[in-house]
Amino acid sequence: MTRLTLALDVMGGDFGPSVTVPAALQALNSNSQLTLLLVGNSDAITPLLAKADFEQRSRLQIIPAQSVIASDARPSQAIRASRGSSMRVALELVKEGRAQACVSAGNTGALMGLAKLLLKPLEGIERPALVTVLPHQQKGKTVVLDLGANVDCDSTMLVQFAIMGSVLAEEVVEIPNPRVALLNIGEEEVKGLDSIRDASAVLKTIPSINYIGYLEANELLTGKTDVLVCDGFTGNVTLKTMEGVVRMFLSLLKSQGEGKKRSWWLLLLKRWLQKSLTRRFSHLNPDQYNGACLLGLRGTVIKSHGAANQRAFAVAIEQAVQAVQRQVPQRIAARLESVYPAGFELLDGGKSGTLR
């Protein structure tokens, strides 16, 4: 494996360096070919590197940044005042070729705007989309996008997301001829927004896309599709609802509970069932799939959950490594070149509509 250099915005997220720096050391332990540029306040970073050994320090470099973009800042204001911020400096390292990818747990809107400004979208892509890979009950994986980068999406954008998601499923998840579906409120052709139905009509005409139609949200984890496409508002709400339910379910499995005294054999059976079920469903733990790729840019950017713990942020770093190794932006660009001649112009000009 060739050497990789990633830029980490270590000041972003709810916990900042207290989580991101230990996660960086964890990632270095897992990958001997990895070099990390830690972007942020050196006074906050340096004490957290006290436990790093000589070999780890040789693959670390602190890149000073003057400020941090607040998680509650309006994206437009954050972008205007972004010079010298840890997020912008990390993205500039990618733009300058000093790093091959950027990982940040910071403000999503600001990251989207700055990434688009500095790294530029691929030819033929209007706006990038946030994408992640979720496990499903068949022990496989489903690519889901958009997860919040674009609140309102027209039909053209949904088609572009489908193409990008299909490439990611093939190249990173290694699913041959991945099935692609649009998230909708029903499976019937007449259901949903005009933008969804218009996107569906176009996807049916693209030979390189294995389009299977609509899928409802309750089937997200069933494994019925390999790529699920939706607008960012719907995707973000769907993802967070699913994560909340999964966390509650796993928490209930692990809890001992309170109540009346039970015989020793019932308590033993209960604990065995808890451990067995926890192992069975542990692959659904959101920490294991943290890290959404900002797909559609000329460079690689990974958005971590703001509330990510050390383990989860280390997973986001690994997501960046995989995206760089698989050359995802280059492969998407190549696929777009082959698809565009098939016809991308939508009859309605890509306008959004109303629910039917």
Curated annotation (Swiss-Prot):
UniProt catalytic activity: a fatty acyl-[ACP] + phosphate = an acyl phosphate + holo-[ACP]
GO cellular component: cytoplasm
Single Gene Ontology MF annotation: phosphate:acyl-[acyl carrier protein] acyltransferase activity
GO BP: fatty acid biosynthetic process; phospholipid biosynthetic process
Compartments (UniProt record): Cytoplasm
Keyword terms: Cytoplasm, Lipid biosynthesis, Lipid metabolism, Phospholipid biosynthesis, Phospholipid metabolism, Transferase
Principal subcellular localization: cytoplasm
Transmembrane regions listed in the UniProt entry: none
The keyword Lipid metabolism is assigned to this record: yes
Record pathway: Lipid metabolism; phospholipid metabolism
Record-listed E.C. numbers: 2.3.1.274
Record note on quaternary structure: Homodimer. Probably interacts with PlsY.
The protein's role, per its UniProt record: Catalyzes the reversible formation of acyl-phosphate (acyl-PO(4)) from acyl-[acyl-carrier-protein] (acyl-ACP). This enzyme utilizes acyl-ACP as fatty acyl donor, but not acyl-CoA.
Stated family: Belongs to the PlsX family.
UniProt-recorded name of the protein: Phosphate acyltransferase
Species, as recorded: Escherichia coli (strain K12)
Chain's gene name: plsX
